[in-house]
From Swiss-Prot:
The gene is era. Residues 5-175 form the Era-type G domain. It comes from Mycolicibacterium paratuberculosis (strain ATCC BAA-968 / K-10). NCBIfam families: era, PRK00089.1, small_GTP. GO terms for biological process: ribosomal small subunit assembly. It comes from the Bacteria. HAMAP family: GTPase_Era (MF_00367). GTP binds at residues 13-20, 60-64, 124-127. This is GTPase Era. Disulfide bonds: none annotated. Keywords: Cell wall, GTP-binding, Nucleotide-binding, RNA-binding, Secreted. Residues 154-156 are annotated as: G5.
Length: 299
């Protein structure tokens, strides 16, 4: 009988390299927010991959970048703290973009903070380019990370090679116990997941300045008194400027209603019951650079 393996795997990379989509594909359900906008993951979300002979706990971090605000610095600190604590680092590099200074900077950060941690390079988004481009990117990634790191191409969207990624990550884990019971897919509280789902819906199709400026806080969650099958969820969406409030709400409140409809459908799946979702938008000026407001909003 093979020895049970378990441990923590951190997926890292530049913003928008497919880390959250890959987390969801590996776990088999939605535990991390995905958006076409970079820098949309704010919290370290753990997804859990269960198999008969191993358990992988995935830590999905924000994209590492050179910080411009206090929030950016805190997010980067979160990533570096994570590097030092995990068993394996999965470096995500997309197949459809040339390796650049950002990728090299991240490899330098990994080598400086976690030189002994096993590194696996994961070439993501292979469905977006022809096979010869994938092959060329594999060579370029090999030159970047060196001979000691294993390299795996994957498409989280089509599912191609997802099982291979799981096998490679599991093989690098140490022997250990199952940290979580079978069937548990994340250790994030439901309120955090609900806030992330609302945030994802609110970010869909909006201008570039909004992702960094939007925070969502769940204010109240209560079962409806006269109905067993309905839960009331009240959420606050915080932006930094009045102009951003207008973007979220839309003409005559149309966009906020769309956000509510999309988020409610996802929250109902998460909770397994009908949901009444009440969304309110507030302005918290320059919250990304204000330590007190960052703390109040959960950072």
């Amino acid at each position: 009988m093979t020895e049970f393996r378990s441990g923590f795997v951190c997926l890292v990379g530049r913003p928008n390299t497919g880390k959250s989509t890959l987390t969801n594909a590996l776990v088999g359900t939605k535990v991390a927010i995905t958006s076409m906008r970079p820098q949309t993951t704010r919290h370290t979300i753990r997804g859990i991959v269960h198999r008969e002979d191993f358990q992988i706990i995935l830590v999905d971090t924000p994209g590492l970048h050179r910080p411009r605000t206090l929030l950016g610095k805190r997010l980067n600190d979160l990533v570096r703290d994570t590097y030092a604590e995990v068993d394996v680092i999965g470096l995500c590099i997309p197949a459809d973009e040339a390796i650049g200074p950002g990728d090299r900077w991240i490899v330098e950060q990994i080598r400086a903070t976690a030189p002994k941690t096993t590194l696996v390079a994961i070439v993501t988004k292979i469905d977006k380019v022809p096979k010869d481009r994938v092959a060329a990117q594999l060579v370029a990634v090999s030159e970047l990370v060196g001979d000691s790191a294993e390299i795996v191409p994957v498409s989280a969207v089509t599912g191609a090679q997802v099982d291979i990624v799981i096998d490679v990550l599991a093989a690098a884990l140490p022997p250990g116990p199952a940290y979580y019971p079978d069937g548990e897919l994340t250790d994030e509280p439901e309120e955090v997941l609900m806030a992330e789902l609302i945030r994802e819906a609110a970010l869909e199709g909006v201008r570039d300045e909004l992702p960094h400026s939007l925070a969502v806080v769940i204010d109240e969650v209560n079962p409806r008194e006269d109905r067993d099958d309905l839960i009331d969820v009240h959420a606050l969406l915080y932006v930094e400027r009045d102009s951003q409030k207008g973007i979220i709400i839309g003409k005559g409140g149309a966009r906020l209603r769309e956000v509510g409809t999309a988020a409610r459908a996802q929250i109902e799946k998460l909770l397994g019951t009908k949901v009444y979702l009440d969304l309110r938008v507030k302005v918290a000026k320059n919250w990304q650079s204000d330590p007190k407001q960052l703390g109040r909003l959960g950072f």
